[in-house]
Amino acid sequence: MHEISLVQGLFQQLADLARQNKMTRVVTVTMQIGPLSGVVADSFRFGFEILSAEDDLVRGADLIINTTAVTYRCSKCGAGIESTAERPESCAECDEIFLLAEGGDELILEKVEME
């Protein structure tokens, strides 16, 4: 489960931000995680909960995960199909099965609220 190491990296980033801004506690962390990022949101949340219990800066902080959409572009007609879940079987416009993914691979620290 590589999400644990991602959360550890996030906590280091939060510690750096807290130090730079002279803050002592993280209240809320908002992440943007794309469905093609390779990150399982539930595992990331689990890692956050487990590791935050051991970290004074992040203990009790809320984690908000926003899932970004992927646009699947048809290679034949160019139509775009947005999805946050599974890849569509085919283009809704022309029934082509070769669809190219655009975006959806984000793993972004979007917002942090600190005290």
What does each model-identified segment do?
Residues Y72, E89, L107:
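Cys/His-enriched microdomains
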Residues M1-A61, N66:
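Long, charged N-terminal interaction/targeting segments
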